[in-house]
Amino acid sequence: MANIESEAVDFEPEEDDLMDEEGTAIDGADVSPRAGHPRLKSAIAGANGESAKKTKGRGFREEKDSDRQRRLSSRDFESLGSDGRPGPQRSVEGWIILVSGVHEETQEEDITNAFGDFGEIKNLNLNLDRRSGYVKGYALIEYEKKEEAQSAISAMNGAELLTQNVSVDWAFSSGPSGGESYRRKNSRYGRSQRSRSPRRRY
């Protein structure tokens, strides 16, 4: 192994290099670099050394809760009303239905042909699997009117689309839309309890 020699540099600060505490020049005082340097004042902790105020998140504000409530109550926010009953909920733009059990090779044109008879389709979302490039197995269809979406659900739920039966229901709902159909969908083959998970291997 090679010996690496390092040369130590001795640094002696000059009088002009040192900070003076009260703005006066240092005349004949101890000029060693370890002499009492003035303490820097923190903008966070304050000049008198008080502890820093803890804040959370970006763009924090120093305001009381009442000020915040007053500021927020003066603004108009777009919101959707709800009657509180269980059933379908409208999205911001329209009524969206979820079609599940869609064949992996289904095209947007196939969905439009099957569901376009019930009303104008405002938006159609057919997600693809990145790895395979095939449809993930579901589609989201948006209608302008609730009646159009309801007629599509009634007519197409259980219907065949490209050799597969599809299930059609509301994409957004508050609680079960129908008691019996909700129980039937969420119970697996008539079992009332969930199966146990296998033991963990160590």
Swiss-Prot record:
Alphabetized UniProt keyword annotations: Cytoplasm, mRNA processing, mRNA splicing, mRNA transport, Nonsense-mediated mRNA decay, Nucleus, Phosphoprotein, RNA-binding, Translation regulation, Transport
Name the UniProt record assigns to this protein: RNA-binding protein Y14
This protein's record includes keyword Phosphoprotein: yes
Keyword match Cytoplasm: yes
Biased composition (Basic residues): 184-202
Source taxon at top rank: Eukaryota
Organism lineage: Eukaryota, Viridiplantae, Streptophyta, Embryophyta, Tracheophyta
UniProt source species: Arabidopsis thaliana (Mouse-ear cress)
Family indicated by similarity: Belongs to the RBM8A family.
Tissue: Expressed in root and shoot meristems, cotyledons, vascular tissues of leaves, receptacle of flowers and siliques, and pollen grains.
Subcellular location(s) of the protein: Nucleus, Nucleolus; Nucleus speckle; Cytoplasm
Gene designation per UniProt: Y14
Modified residues (Phosphoserine): 32
